């Protein structure tokens, strides 16, 4: 009798845990969701790296220009998932960013499919793409840092900060960041 109760209790806990994780994943915007379903905030990512910096890697998939001029986590290696092509979109007049055809091969050059990799971009969208590309290539422990380096934009017309990226993200979380460049961490095409 006690054994049946224990089995039911364990099953109930597992089902509840799965339901909570599923709900958390679906509350994310589609653009930040990944096939692996592994998500961290910038704060959680820094803690995870800090606890096990020998085994946890932080990968910044923004363009080299963003990495250099906006700042970056001091331990983050830059391998862009998308690169600028020097054109502007007709509709919104924004830079056109094309998929970096060497992204997966460059990651494979330095990391194994079994490594724990925490991926950040500006605000979580490109990092989701990077996670999915790496998952397709056989990587299994790749996390999307859902608020990225700069964080999400404030959406409050009454706020002075409306449209500004001051809400969350690595830079706003209190985690270390820098403009200092380390050649071994910079993108080398």
Located regions from the model:
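Bacterial N-terminal signal peptides that target proteins for export
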Residues: 1-10
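Rhodanese-like catalytic fold shared by cysteine-dependent sulfurtransferases
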Residues: 2, 20-54, 68-116, 127-189
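Bacterial N-terminal signal peptides
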Residues: 9-20
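Short, flexible active-site loop motifs that bind/organize anionic cofactors or intermediates
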Residues: 14, 35, 57
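Short hydrophobic beta-strand that contains or immediately precedes a catalytic carboxylate
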Residues: 57-62, 79
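Short, surface-exposed ligand- or partner-binding patches at beta-edge/loop junctions that are enriched
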Residues: 120
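Conserved G/P- and acidic residue-centered "switch" motifs that form tight phosphate/ATP-binding loops
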Residues: 124
